[in-house]
Amino acid sequence: MDDRHEGDHHDIEVEGGALHGFERKISGILDDGSVGFRQPLLARNRKNTTSQIAIVGANTCPIESLDYEIFENDFFKQDWRSRKKIEILQYTFLKWALAFLIGLATGLVGFLNNLGVENIAGFKLLLIGNLMLKEKYFQAFFAFAGCNLILATAAASLCAFIAPAAAGSGIPEVKAYLNGIDAYSILAPSTLFVKIFGSIFGVAAGFVVGKEGPMVHTGACIANLLGQGGSKKYRLTWKWLRFFKNDRDRRDLITCGAAAGVAAAFRAPVGGVLFALEEAASWWRNALLWRTFFTTAVVAVVLRSLIEFCRSGRCGLFGKGGLIMFDVNSGPVLYSTPDLLAIVFLGVIGGVLGSLYNYLVDKVLRTYSIINEKGPRFKIMLVMAVSILSSCCAFGLPWLSQCTPCPIGIEEGKCPSVGRSSIYKSFQCPPNHYNDLSSLLLNTNDDAIRNLFTSRSENEFHISTLAIFFVAVYCLGIITYGIAIPSGLFIPVILAGASYGRLVGRLLGPVSQLDVGLFSLLGAASFLGGTMRMTVSLCVILLELTNNLLMLPLVMLVLLISKTVADCFNRGVYDQIVTMKGLPYMEDHAEPYMRNLVAKDVVSGALISFSRVEKVGVIWQALKMTRHNGFPVIDEPPFTEASELCGIALRSHLLVLLQGKKFSKQRTTFGSQILRSCKARDFGKAGLGKGLKIEDLDLSEEEMEMYVDLHPITNTSPYTVLETLSLAKAAILFRQLGLRHLCVVPKTPGRPPIVGILTRHDFMPEHVLGLYPHIDPLK
């Protein structure tokens, strides 16, 4: 980890005469009274005690930081100078080729996901419908609950035993990754596998969840898999792929994958690009905009082609459903003053209900995390309990609704309908009657939204039905999110918002000129704005979903109002989840209290540094006894006249250098020999599988006493700030440049060349306010 604040490692004992040099150098760190540059520049109690673990999915695991900075050491410079024009062309071509493959793969996975959900859920609903027609109500309930329970258990088992990181929507984890946070299996192939099949089983099981969030995570996993740079273990290496053995290029690919996931889930290519820009990515530039747009365009073409292929009935029960496209185009959109007042009211209600939703989701997630920590069995039992409750609500609540006569003039056979999805479901009703609540609860979530968005259907749903459905979906959405299955928040939020939006439209009645289907859309927009706090991307996604550009001004208005109101209470749901999971996310702004501090005020822990030519045993022992990922390299006499900062060496590069055993018995510079014997690709980030560990090194006692020149692997141009720089400016600099390490140097000469190193953990509020509890967090 890049946390350099190992409180447990302050008392280091070194055994064996071979390592007496390290013991002598570390002794300066342990002696508060000494003045060497290897000592801590702060008192012992100035340690960073922020957590180095976080919740990823439904699992607690260690976290790392990513190296988004270009590491300009001698190997990088040599590789950059030696690149030919054809190699630069290959690199550019490969970026676009991988963007195409990400779009193609994500589109295929999105289609197969929907195909599976529609067929599994469709078979289940047809079975229930046939039993209800035969008035076998108990058998219908047990068949319904049993199918849901089996599917839910399958999804939970995959998450509990194969990839706990696949639980939840995955958007907070992807957002954290693009901010520079990595965790074990966050984008692993096993996570991708469970995300796909767990999402199919979970959505088909009738939970109030969506597949949109999991699709974002799925797209990111696909991008990560394609951008691994090959695998030596499975002999999947290719010379071109070496260009992507770094976090910076993988970050761009994963941004494309996240955008492709939204495009595949909503059939909203432009909305996918804007979602990645507004919510997911922490860094953006024009070149990335082009590639994400190209990726989502590929997704759109793939989905359109596959949907056309299925229109002739070649895909089983898959038809209009699944890849949701809600056509609420009802001609000219006319509205009066009462309509505008109602829209403002919808925005306010959406903001209040959305902030309350976020608050309750946070409380439920904290409770579920306690249960999930007890082991896989408890995760599965929790999923089963929520499944049974959801089945009881979906099957039991329609009995509270009254049977409604079919509308006059409707085509014969459409009311009540016999198919698996319709707005007119008979349930227990007599001939020529339908149960409106069953058409919302005993349906796939996509079809329920489609029914709520239906235009020119003012009286199809009773006011009491909409109220019952809203309360049920609101509560079930809260208690379902957080269980150990892949689950998204978009669909529950759209369902709840569309139901109360339609309810407001019904209450207005003849006073309003807007169709109730349009009120459903505006209600969904208000609730989305109140929970997720996005505006531009949500507006475009909703317009692409509904194919109704005439609603643009009203959707913009309701989103702005709901977001403004909700911001008065708390943060967006994904921001809250990131904080709750313990992910050290760097915001794009500095906190107000940071202006009262300077960089040196939060530098913590004992700083361990190396000489340019260092003894192998000293490096080995430092790597063994700490988890630091960055070590300052100091030029010392006789190589320079005075001690000066040479740069930073990464832990991964040190391990590769030690494994190569490019040592010397004399303490002399021999970096040119190392440059000739190694290549830049040898120091590239590991792809599939884990990189080198200190335990993998096999060094003899004789080798421990030898020396190694660290200059070839040292980033000689690290970002540095003066110790007197405002902490607020340091935080903004750290965030905007995507740094992992920020060196703090002294302002006055004659002191040690480096004061300390800042990492993202040093900017976390719990660390800063822990050091200075008297500071007002709001000032």
UniProtKB/Swiss-Prot annotation:
Gene3D superfamilies: CBS-domain (3.10.580.10), Clc chloride channel (1.10.3080.10)
Entry-linked Pfam families: CBS, Voltage_CLC
Keyword Lipid metabolism attributed: no
Alphabetical list of PROSITE patterns matching this protein: CBS
Tissue specificity annotation: Broadly expressed in the plant.
Location in the cell: Membrane
Topology relative to the membrane: Multi-pass membrane protein
SMART domains the UniProt entry points to: CBS
Positions of modified residues (Phosphoserine): S27, S672
Domain CBS: 601-659, 713-777
Gene Ontology CC terms: chloride channel complex; plant-type vacuole; plant-type vacuole membrane; plastid
InterPro entries (UniProt xref): CBS_dom, CBS_dom_sf, Cl-channel/antiporter, Cl-channel_core, Cl_channel_pln, ClC
Segment forming the signal sequence: none
Disulfide bond annotation, renumbered to this chain: none
An example molecular function term from Gene Ontology annotations: voltage-gated chloride channel activity
Keyword tags: CBS domain, Chloride, Chloride channel, Ion channel, Ion transport, Membrane, Phosphoprotein, Repeat, Transmembrane, Transmembrane helix, Transport, Voltage-gated channel
Entry's transmembrane regions: 92-112, 142-162, 190-210, 215-235, 257-277, 287-307, 341-361, 380-400, 466-486, 488-508, 520-540, 541-561, 741-761
Family as reported in the entry's similarity comment: Belongs to the chloride channel (TC 2.A.49) family.
Subunit annotation: Homodimer. Interacts with PP2A5.
UniProt function note: Voltage-gated chloride channel.
The protein, known as: Chloride channel protein CLC-c
Source organism: Arabidopsis thaliana
Gene that this sequence comes from: CLC-C
